[in-house]
Amino acid sequence: MKQVLPIHKVRKDVILGSRRFSNYWWASTIFIGALGFLLAGLSSYFQTDLLPFANSTELVFIPQGIVMTFYGSVGIFLSMFLWLTIIWNIGAGYNEFNKNEGIVKIFRLGFPGKNRQICLKFNIKEIKSIKIDIKEGLNPRREIYLCTKDKRNIPLTRVGQPLLLSEVEEQAAEIARFLDVVLEGA
């Protein structure tokens, strides 16, 4: 999502973090499945039905019950990790290109701690080009990079599902045109 202020000298692209539908889906699905495994394993240990729709007391605790308890515990921890990344909105932020101040600001949220907020600032004069990196195949990658004169490539696109090729090209061209720099492909 881009936002160009009326002065047309400031461009701000909002970056979606981990609060996407797919993350909510996987965190919920893993939690429900892991809870089922954990309750089935505990049912076999305590010989009490903790799952109302299944008879888990017939499971032998060693080896089936203990394995299900282990997988359930691991799944619960994985889902908690996913829920925490959603709550903390890891990866969210913005790219701000400000011609008035001559600064490019890249801001992202990280994990809690010393580096929770990551803010990179560059002088517009330090920017050499905007680069598009496209790799097709089983794990496609379509990314836009801000290339500086000291040969650093800073990613501008969000992490997750790749954007459509036309969207990547259009967004990169708009940024390059706004900054008056070269657009290059990889």
UniProtKB/Swiss-Prot annotation:
InterPro entries: PSI_Ycf4_assembly. The chain crosses the membrane at residues 21-43, 66-88. GO terms for biological process: photosynthesis. GO terms for cellular component: chloroplast thylakoid membrane; photosystem I. Keywords: Chloroplast, Membrane, Photosynthesis, Plastid, Thylakoid, Transmembrane, Transmembrane helix. Its main location: plastid. Seems to be required for the assembly of the photosystem I complex. PANTHER family: PHOTOSYSTEM I ASSEMBLY PROTEIN YCF4, PTHR33288. Belongs to the Ycf4 family. This is Photosystem I assembly protein Ycf4.
